[in-house]
Amino acid sequence: MSIQHFRVAPIPFFAAFCLPVFAHPETLVKVKDAEDQLGARVGYIELDLNSGKILESFRPEERFPMMSTFKVLLCGAVLSRVDAGQEQLGRRIHYSQNDLVEYSPVTEEHLTDGMTVRELCSAAITMSDNTAANLLLTTIGGPKELTAFLHSMGDHVTRLDRWEPELNEAIPNDERDTTMPAAMATTLRKLLTGELLTLASRQQLIDWMEADKVAGPLLRSALPAGWFIADKSGAGERGSRGIIAALGPDGKPSRIVVIYTTGSQATMDERNRQIAEIGASLIKHW
């Protein structure tokens, strides 16, 4: 479903950390089953986009590695600077071979001509390009400045400490480069619906997420025709996998869903399958 049929609009922000209402416990049963199948921790939360009310949650306040899901927050910070007149999406950034890190399918093709800030955000979100993320991090002042931006939004949980690809290390009990499902869901909701960004910037962020090209095996694989999804996946060491999404029927999003898992010995295909099955249960019991 094209984003042309959906436009973001301001929605008053209410505290999302209310008591959960387990309207469809079948999905939580599937989340717990995924833990058993993967031999790993799984964190899950589902928020109503309009009210911020928690609809379902499992391990919502346990820390998980962010992996590449942080790239949405990063581009939110970039757009905030654009709104403040401190950055321009059309500004071209030049870089060298020495700047390239592993998994940079877009930036490696533009060594001669460079890329605009807009193009870098698109590459970071739609293709999860790691060099694009590092170049964007440089424009805002590095990982600590992204953490400071999140603090300014009221998120004192989510933190970025390192650059790509080291931030994907996912060492157990290491709080670096981590978030909690509840914190991530609330922050994503603020970026997409709150007053932090202008309407144009909110629309741009969700456009990039809707155009995600690397999350096909996850929630997208369970979506019926006509549903809307804008998402960003992540993968890391020690069996870590994650996805953050805004989705809903009738071509527009109505819920925020965040799923993280870490500590599994399972293959990537199996991790993808378990997340897709959680998505299938979510949709079945919508």
Description of each model-found segment:
Residues 24-36, 50, 55, 138-139, ...:
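Structured C-terminal helix/loop/strand segments within mature extracytoplasmic catalytic/sensor domains
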Residues 100-135, 143:
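Conserved catalytic neighborhood of penicillin-recognizing serine enzymes
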Residues 1-11:
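Bacterial N-terminal signal peptides that target proteins for export
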Residues 35-64, 87:
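Short, conserved catalytic-motif segment at the N-terminal edge
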Residues 52, 64-93, 257:
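Active-site SXXK
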Residues 10-20:
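Bacterial N-terminal signal peptides
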